[in-house]
Amino acid sequence: MTASRRTLMVMAGGTGGHVFPGLAVAHRMEAAGWRVVWLGNPAGMEATLVPKHGIPMEYVRFGGLRGKGLKTKLTLPFNLLRACWQSLGALRRVRPDVVLGMGGYITFPAGVMTALSGRPLVLHEQNSIAGLANKVLAKFAKRVLVAFPDALPHAEWTGNPIRAELARTEAPKARYASRSGPLHVLVVGGSLGAAALNEVVPRALALLAPGERPRIVHQAGAKHIDALKANYEAAGFAGGDDVRLVPFIDDMASAYAAADLVICRSGAMTVSEIAAVGVAALFVPFPYAVDDHQTTNAAFLADAGAAVLVQQRDLSAQLLADWLRGQSRASLAAMAERSRSLAKPEATDEVARVCAKVAGANLEQLQ
């Protein structure tokens, strides 16, 4: 069987943290001549996003229990059985040579049926603390891959698959050396915004003398941009060249590369992207993340002196202002270089090669 006839099924959904790394691998496999089919939830973001990338989809209806009512919990056995049946149907139609599980609730029933049908399963865990589904499925997978060391026992540390342009960014030493003047700070709230950052950062800047203030690009999410503007105006900033407030950023690679410092949450993909680019970071983990995984994500870099970790409960305008006052471009450049040294820029290729090998393909087809 030639590479062009081989098929990869990617099962992932729910959040961008599962979908985007799955897309990175999918495109890499397509470039090697593979057919790729995506298994996802028709109600998930993947149902809208994945077809835009030209990847056909199979659908399985299955959701989580966290925060759901009694009715959802009582109907779980039926919903799980239905999801298993739908997954089996998709596997029979697609007949994949290998199945790659990238996370999300649908991974559990689809992964179980993959194992029961005798098809090879590869798992990838994006977070530093594995979810329950991957902990169970790891017992049946041919290969288990992790983005952070020790997330699962007997797993291979590959890093998180990221967009190619992030891995191609110029080395931090050269970037930082080419700059002068005020520090450039990127504040990232994500598509959902981060209220704590939106409130504290403007007040922290107001505590700095004009000559101490960095230039700011602050991304807040479309739903939060008006409130963010009000926060900056209340702190005495009317906007201008030194403060840019944006609802979204299309080119994150360039935004990261232009920054001396990123202030942000610590989702798995954010941490992986920051390391890949090599930029200093101050992480404020989302305090309500499942198993507090954002803290351990951030700690991977912070423990190596490659980032700073501040819990939201400890974050204040005074603390942030004092910390910013003590930073120089040289100190941030050193942090950025340590961050880059911990990156896994070949993660996308490595995950693709593992999938090919499990399917019995010649690895030279993925060079």
Curated annotation (Swiss-Prot):
Its EC number is 2.4.1.227. UDP-N-acetyl-alpha-D-glucosamine binds at T15, G16, G17, N127, R163, S191, I249, Q294. The keyword Cell wall biogenesis/degradation applies. GO terms for molecular function: UDP-N-acetyl-D-glucosamine:N-acetylmuramoyl-L-alanyl-D-glutamyl-meso-2,6-diaminopimelyl-D-alanyl-D-alanine-diphosphoundecaprenol 4-beta-N-acetylglucosaminlytransferase activity; undecaprenyldiphospho-muramoylpentapeptide beta-N-acetylglucosaminyltransferase activity. It is a peripheral membrane protein. Its main location: membrane. It is found in: Cell inner membrane. GO terms for biological process: carbohydrate metabolic process; cell division; cell wall organization; lipid glycosylation; peptidoglycan biosynthetic process; regulation of cell shape. Pfam families: Glyco_tran_28_C, Glyco_transf_28. Keywords: Cell cycle, Cell division, Cell inner membrane, Cell membrane, Cell shape, Cell wall biogenesis/degradation, Glycosyltransferase, Membrane, Peptidoglycan synthesis, Transferase. GO terms for cellular component: plasma membrane. It catalyses: di-trans,octa-cis-undecaprenyl diphospho-N-acetyl-alpha-D-muramoyl-L-alanyl-D-glutamyl-meso-2,6-diaminopimeloyl-D-alanyl-D-alanine + UDP-N-acetyl-alpha-D-glucosamine = di-trans,octa-cis-undecaprenyl diphospho-[N-acetyl-alpha-D-glucosaminyl-(1->4)]-N-acetyl-alpha-D-muramoyl-L-alanyl-D-glutamyl-meso-2,6-diaminopimeloyl-D-alanyl-D-alanine + UDP + H(+). HAMAP family: MurG. Belongs to the glycosyltransferase 28 family. MurG subfamily. Cell wall formation. Catalyzes the transfer of a GlcNAc subunit on undecaprenyl-pyrophosphoryl-MurNAc-pentapeptide (lipid intermediate I) to form undecaprenyl-pyrophosphoryl-MurNAc-(pentapeptide)GlcNAc (lipid intermediate II). This is UDP-N-acetylglucosamine--N-acetylmuramyl-(pentapeptide) pyrophosphoryl-undecaprenol N-acetylglucosamine transferase. It comes from Burkholderia vietnamiensis (strain G4 / LMG 22486). The gene is murG.
